[in-house]
């Protein structure tokens, strides 16, 4: 079962989004692996959500936001539930001004991660020997 959780509250006065806590977490869980994206820079994320057009693009910022050199600390936690219980932690610091590069890197990284998950869970291991060869 896949679920998304965003710790955001609605601000009716300005029509923007405000962080409820100092850390907002977006977690995506599937049967094979868990993906947790945590934002540790609450001030920068507050400015990001307060000025973005939610109905349009997530990274569509206003002109004032483009002038600011905001650095958001994105921490990626990848946890694979396998026999080895491998834990991978990646930390990426991204400038909002180069958000297109972030989107490209994020989709490339998620694509490579999905390929590795397919290889891990759906393909036979290297030590796999078919039954026909075992009989001979």
UniProtKB/Swiss-Prot annotation:
Transmembrane segments: 102-118
Keywords, sorted A to Z: Membrane, Transmembrane, Transmembrane helix
Keyword Membrane: yes
Mode of membrane association: Single-pass membrane protein
Superkingdom of the source species: Eukaryota
Chief place where the protein resides: membrane
Gene Ontology CC terms, in alphabetical order: membrane
Localization per Swiss-Prot or TrEMBL: Membrane
Additional detail: Partially overlaps MES1.
The name this protein goes by in its record: Putative uncharacterized protein YGR265W
Species: Saccharomyces cerevisiae (strain ATCC 204508 / S288c)
